[in-house]
A protein has these predicted regions:
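Proline-aspartate-enriched helix->loop->beta-strand connector
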Residues: 123, 127-136
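C-terminal motif of bacterial Sec signal peptides marking the signal peptidase cleavage site
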Residues: 20-23
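Active-site neighborhood of divalent metal-dependent phosphoester/pyrophosphate hydrolases
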Residues: 106-109, 133-144
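Bacterial N-terminal signal peptides that target proteins for export
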Residues: 1-10
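Active-site regions of metal-assisted phosphoester/phosphodiester hydrolases
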Residues: 25-45, 54, 89-126, 154, ...
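Hydrophobic helical h-region of N-terminal Sec-dependent signal peptides
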Residues: 10-18
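Long, intrinsically disordered low-complexity tandem-repeat segments
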Residues: 54-90
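Serine residues within intrinsically disordered or low-complexity segments
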Residues: 36, 41, 48-50, 63-65, ...
Length: 326
């Protein structure tokens, strides 16, 4: 009988313990709202960014670490792949450098009635990037003491850092010579005197131009004509020009060569000419006097365009070149 009673009390005791445990847990869920918030915050689901960033336990930390490692690996791999793909795509789609360059003998604007706006319009209408001028006046009386290069640059909307005048001779109270005008800044400029004998002094002008990080060596000249013993003088002048250009792989030469013999320029090594085969630039019907010569190591050029309404005794010639030097 005592055993049965003991067994009964043992069963009753177990039942009471179980009931108490269940009641306590239930009571905590219903009334312990503060404890619930603490739990939620602990696993990183609160709106606080700092709380969210914290791992809750080792297991979670390991998992997070693994995810981070996987993410880094994936990102690194993806970044490399993307970089390679981007680099390759950039190489394939990179736009080559192109320039429209012109040679323009403006006859000191006399044919334009000394109205430089007409000459400037020719340049802007054709989208010229760099132009080499011949027969430019600089503060001469006949031109009303005007700085023609500064005036042309202003009318055409070219920057003040992109134009320069190069004096060949003193004339009419001022100077007369060559000019270079560029949409891009001229970093350096110089010129050399060419052998001219007793005739009018001739020069070769040079500008070092920064075209979006690529240095272009741009030259302009105006050589002797036959009436002043130009044949023998020009041969010397071309040789002197060739010597000067030999120091540059990346050059463009513009000018009025005053000769119909288009082979004379060939003393300039690694070069080619735009304006071959009868492109008339002087209005007597057969005189291709104005030319563009370029380094074949750095450039290719398309066919030239001749602008017949040039307000001068010469037509403006221009062509587009593509930079190929790596």
């Amino acid at each position: 009988m005592r055993r049965k009673i003991n067994s009964f009390f043992a069963i009753l005791l177990c039942f009471s313990v179980a009931f108490c445990a269940t009641g306590c847990m239930s009571h905590g869920e219903n009334n312990g709202t503060g404890g619930s918030q603490s739990y939620t915050s602990g696993i990183g689901f609160s709106e606080s960014e700092s709380d969210t960033a914290k791992p809750i336990d080792k297991a979670t930390d390991k998992s997070t670490s693994t995810n981070k490692s996987t993410s880094k690996s994936t990102n690194k791999s993806t970044d490399k792949s993307t970089d390679k793909s981007t680099d390759k795509s950039t190489e394939e789609t990179e736009t080559p450098l192109t320039l429209k360059v012109a040679s323009y003998n403006i006859f000191h604007a006399e044919k334009a009635g000394y109205d430089l706006s007409k000459i400037a319009k020719n340049i802007t209408d054709n989208g010229i990037d760099i132009v080499g001028f011949q027969e430019v006046d600089h503060f001469t009386r006949r031109n009303g003491n005007v700085n023609q290069m500064a005036k042309l640059a202003s009318l055409a909307g070219y920057p003040g850092t992109g134009r320069w005048f190069y004096p060949a001779i003193d004339h009419d109270g001022g100077q007369y010579g060559l000019g270079i005008m560029s949409r891009y800044p001229i970093l350096k400029h110089d010129y050399i005197k060419l052998s001219s004998g007793t005739a009018e002094q001739r020069i070769l002008a040079h500008a070092e131009i920064d075209v979006n990080g690529t240095i272009v060596h741009f030259f302009v000249t105006h050589l002797s004509y036959d009436g002043e013993g130009g044949g023998s003088s020009r041969a010397k002048q071309f040789n002197e020009i060739a010597t000067k250009l030999s120091g540059y792989d990346n050059f463009i030469l513009t000018g009025d060569f005053n000769t119909r013999d288009l082979t004379e320029y060939k003393v300039i090594s690694n070069s080619a000419m735009v304006n071959a085969k009868g492109a008339v630039t002087y209005p007597d019907g057969n005189s291709p006097l104005d030319n563009i010569v370029y380094s074949t190591k750095a450039w290719t050029f398309g066919e030239p365009t001749i602008v017949t309404k040039s307000y001068s005794d010469h037509y403006m010639i221009f062509a587009q070149g593509t930079y190929i030097k790596k």
